[in-house]
Amino acid sequence: MKIKGLVDEDFVNFKLPCMFISIGTCNWKCCIEANIPVTVCQNSDLAKQKDIDTPIDEIFNRYISNPISEAIVIGGLEPMMQFEDVYNLIKYFRSKGVNDTFVIYTGYYPNEIQDKIEKLKTFKNIICKFGRYVPNQEKHFDDVLEVNLVSDNQYGEVIS
């Protein structure tokens, strides 16, 4: 799986302590639609980092070896651009009997990725954070993720 980084214990992206996986691909839709430079994106520096090829079983073993993390968050750049990797990661965890929550931070809206959402519904405990980054908005508390999100159009939704 091509990633940009992995944090074994993250406490800011979900209500539970989680493993955070940074995906390595983006089409910069948020910046393009807002007509702002890509450098404004909080993930622009992440995009410049070298890709790390990480086997799914290695991610799994790191997760289950950590007594603190209770969920997995997959985020920026854009996870839906590596959907097969994301799907296969979740499938691997489920095949090993781990049904902990997966949270996918995407800049897409449900109507743009309905086919992918339908595939994700085949798994238990999936949450998506939907919505593009829009500059100059006030952050707000999301009741599903139980964390602050930076744009008021962004929201968490339980998929399954």
What does each of the following model-derived ranges do?
Residues 117-137:
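Short, hydrophobic/π-rich interface segment
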Residues 14-15, 64-68, 121-123:
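Flexible, charged surface loops at secondary-structure boundaries
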Residues 4-6, 11-54:
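Canonical Radical SAM [4Fe-4S] cluster-binding loop centered on the CxxxCxxC motif
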Residues 18-20, 71-73, 101-103, 127:
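Structural preference for beta-strand elements that scaffold enzyme active sites
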Residues 44-61, 80-122:
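Canonical radical SAM enzyme core domain
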Residues 68-96, 130-134, 138-159:
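Conserved glycine-rich "GG(E/T)P / GGGxP" loop and the immediately following alpha-helix
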Residues 37, 68, 98, 123-124:
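Short loop/turn motifs at secondary-structure junctions
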Residues 23, 76, 104-106, 132:
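A cross-domain feature marking catalytic cores of carbohydrate-active enzymes
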